Design a protein with these regions (language model features):
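Active-site beta-to-alpha loop of glycosyltransferases that engages the nucleotide-sugar donor
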Residues: 71-85, 101
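Short, acidic, metal-binding catalytic loop of nucleotide-sugar glycosyltransferases
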Residues: 85-94
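Cell-envelope/extracellular polymer assembly enzymes that use nucleotide-activated donors
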Residues: 66-68
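Active-site-proximal specificity loops/subdomain of glycosyltransferases
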Residues: 104-157, 166, 171
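Conserved short acidic donor-positioning loop in nucleotide-sugar-dependent glycosyltransferases
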Residues: 100-103, 163
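Catalytic-site signature of metal-activated, phosphate-bearing donor transferases
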Residues: 4-49, 137-142, 166-340
Length: 340
């Protein structure tokens, strides 16, 4: 093909084809290469195909999508206010907290009564339920999905020590609705977001400051970053098969990575993907707070404080955090042990 150099022809034909038609034939692309414009086109197409892309995030129309969060918690009064406020700022419509405290234990109403009165937080009575089954946490999750799927478009299943952070788009922070309303998630039944676990940052004791500000150093146990947590659609039409795993919830949903790319994963993906969002996991906090967590047990049962079980907990802490004599002494003093 003879290359036409006429500016008049360029303005009428090429420019019109470039900006008014999506399909650009190969001959025109060859011409554009001559003037260097094709490089920009290739970059734009790559960005569109590989990353979350919003034309103008500042002008996004207020979303009608409703996103809720479900969690189960026990002895978390020191941390529950920060958790609730964090997800309120992210735009979540409601949080369902399954209260797993002992019958005569603390009450979440003592610290978040205002959020309960406003309707943003709803407390579900699971008090004393711990220990009756081997899958208490999953019982709570399945009850939440069954009971409230008609009130939300999506439900996130996170723990109190897990904080979702959504990556900005074009320099603009997104709410959870704005994130999930993006076209890259249209085909997703579940969005799986990787952990990024944090260490004790060489702190020893509880401090009444936000967890997200106190702990900045990453965990030594990098393999744990492969764990994911799920946000699941509520209008799934096919049968949902229970996974009996808090990182998966259901084993037969169409999973996506945090940037919307399809990938069928259940509860673990390594290396982690942080392109769309990340869950910052404050798993141990300080050694003194960790010891309180060990005493508390999990949703299923209280750990027997025998030497074998305590040994497991001791070694896990120092697999995640730097080992120092002072931390070892605190653990031994609290549990009357003699670990080295």
């Amino acid at each position: 093909m003879k290359i036409v150099k006429s500016n008049k022809w360029y303005k009428k034909k090429v420019k019109k084809s470039l900006f008014n038609n999506i399909k650009i034939n190969k001959k025109v692309i060859a011409y554009l290469k001559k003037i260097g414009l094709c490089i920009g086109m290739i970059i734009i197409l790559q960005l569109k195909n590989n990353f979350i892309f919003v034309k103008d995030a500042k002008n996004i129309i207020k979303s009608q999508t409703k996103v809720c969060l479900c969690c189960i918690a026990k002895k978390e009064n020191l941390y529950i206010s920060e958790f609730v406020n964090h997800y309120k700022k992210l735009g979540y419509n409601r949080i369902y907290i399954y209260d797993n405290n002992d019958i005569d234990g603390e009450h979440f109403e003592e610290v978040i009564q205002q959020e309960i009165n406003s309707g943003f937080t709803k407390i579900m009575n699971f008090r004393g339920y711990r220990g009756k089954r081997d899958d208490t946490q999953m019982d709570a999750y399945y009850d939440c999905y069954r009971r409230y799927n008609s009130e939300c478009n999506w439900i996130s299943f996170f723990d109190i020590d897990e904080f979702l952070f959504i990556n900005p788009v074009n320099g603009t922070n997104l709410t959870i609705q704005e994130m999930l309303d993006q076209p890259v998630y249209d085909h997703c039944e579940s969005v799986k977001i990787n952990w990024k676990s944090f260490s004790d940052s060489e702190l020893l004791y509880y401090d009444n400051k936000p967890v997200t500000e106190r702990f900045k150093q990453l965990s030594k146990f990098g393999y744990e970053f492969g764990n994911v947590k799920s946000t699941i659609r509520t209008n799934i039409s096919h049968y949902l098969r229970k996974a009996f795993n808090p990182h998966a919830i259901f084993s037969n949903v169409k999973g996506c990575l945090s940037d919307g790319r399809r990938k069928q994963i259940d509860f673990f993906m390594f290396p982690p993907n942080y392109k769309g969002a990340v869950i910052k996991h404050y798993v141990t906090k300080t050694i003194s707070e960790y010891c309180n967590k060990v005493k508390r047990g999990n949703a299923e049962k209280t750990f027997k404080l025998d030497p074998a079980k305590l040994g497991e907990r001791f070694h896990y802490f120092f697999m995640t955090n730097k080992k120092t004599k002072e931390k070892v002494n605190i653990f031994n003093r609290i549990f009357n042990t003699s670990f080295k």
